[in-house]
Amino acid sequence: MIHFKGLIFYHYSAGDDVAIHTQDMAWLEESDVVVAEVTQPSLGVGYEIGRAVAWKKRILCLYRPDDGKGLSAMVRGAHDGKNFIVKDYQEPEVPGILKEFLSSS
C-alpha cells in the first residue's frame, strides 16, 4: 500500500483470481471516488468503471491523447461533467487535475 497525500494506492502480487476480484471490489465499494487511467484499453479497468457507475461513484478517467490511439466512445461518451469526468492530459498536469477533481467531490 502506498500513501500519497491522502490517496491510497494498492499493489499486490499475482494470486488467486477470485481473491483478487473480491479484494478489488471491496476496495472499489469502500471508495468515495475512482480515478482510472484509460489510455491503454483494459477489460479489467472497464469492468471496474462499470461497477463504479452502478454504485454511483464519482469517476475521473485520465487519457493521454499523444499515445496515438483513440479513446473508446463508451468512455468518452459517458462524460457528464459532474459524476463521470473524462480529461485528456499530459503528465505535468496530473496533480492539478487530481486536486480539482478531489476538491469538487
UniProtKB/Swiss-Prot annotation:
The keyword Zinc does not apply. It comes from Branchiostoma floridae. Part of a nucleotide salvage pathway that eliminates epigenetically modified 5-hydroxymethyl-dCMP (hmdCMP) in a two-step process entailing deamination to cytotoxic 5-hydroxymethyl-dUMP (hmdUMP), followed by its hydrolysis into 5-hydroxymethyluracil (hmU) and 2-deoxy-D-ribose 5-phosphate (deoxyribosephosphate). Catalyzes the second step in that pathway, the hydrolysis of the N-glycosidic bond in hmdUMP, degrading this cytotoxic nucleotide to avoid its genomic integration. The lineage of its organism: Eukaryota, Metazoa, Chordata, Cephalochordata, Leptocardii. This is 5-hydroxymethyl-dUMP N-hydrolase. GO terms for biological process: deoxyribonucleoside monophosphate catabolic process; nucleoside salvage; nucleotide metabolic process; positive regulation of cell growth. It catalyses: 5-hydroxymethyl-dUMP + H2O = 5-hydroxymethyluracil + 2-deoxy-D-ribose 5-phosphate. One of its GO terms (cellular component) is cytoplasm. The keyword Kinase does not apply.
